[in-house]
């Protein structure tokens, strides 16, 4: 993937952006922003709720079969984001304590272009 590292110098990460972030173990991951600073995220019955309201997710995004720590409401701090992988059943993301809420300073940029696999060269759109 190609990453725009400058975009968040002039703007803020938005819901559904696909971002690269650095985990506390210094590994890099690519995930989608679901929860924004100040919001409360919960996963109930396979659906994502933001501040108690059902999230209208993008077409093609899978339901969440495992809520993890989001089975109870998670309040995000002013600089925290809740990230999920698009392949919900096999993604290590904010639902799990080893990732948890991702701080703004951990986000390194927005995914802009996919170059692998070669048959799927494509620009990445947030919505």
What do the predicted segments below correspond to?
Residues 1-127:
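Soluble "head" domains of membrane/secretory-pathway proteins
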């Amino acid at each position: 993937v190609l990453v725009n590292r400058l975009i968040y110098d002039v703007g803020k990460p938005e819901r559904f952006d696909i971002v690269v972030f650095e985990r506390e173990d210094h590994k890099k991951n690519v995930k989608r922003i679901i929860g924004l600073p100040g919001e409360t995220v919960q996963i109930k019955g396979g659906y994502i709720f933001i501040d108690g309201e059902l999230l209208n997710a993008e077409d093609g995004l899978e339901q969440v079969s495992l809520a993890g720590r989001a089975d109870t409401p998670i309040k995000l701090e002013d600089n925290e984001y809740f990230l999920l992988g698009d392949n919900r059943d096999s993604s290590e993301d904010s639902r799990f304590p080893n990732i948890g809420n991702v701080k703004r300073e951990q986000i390194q940029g927005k995914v802009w272009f996919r170059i692998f696999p070669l048959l799927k060269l494509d620009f990445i759109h947030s919505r």
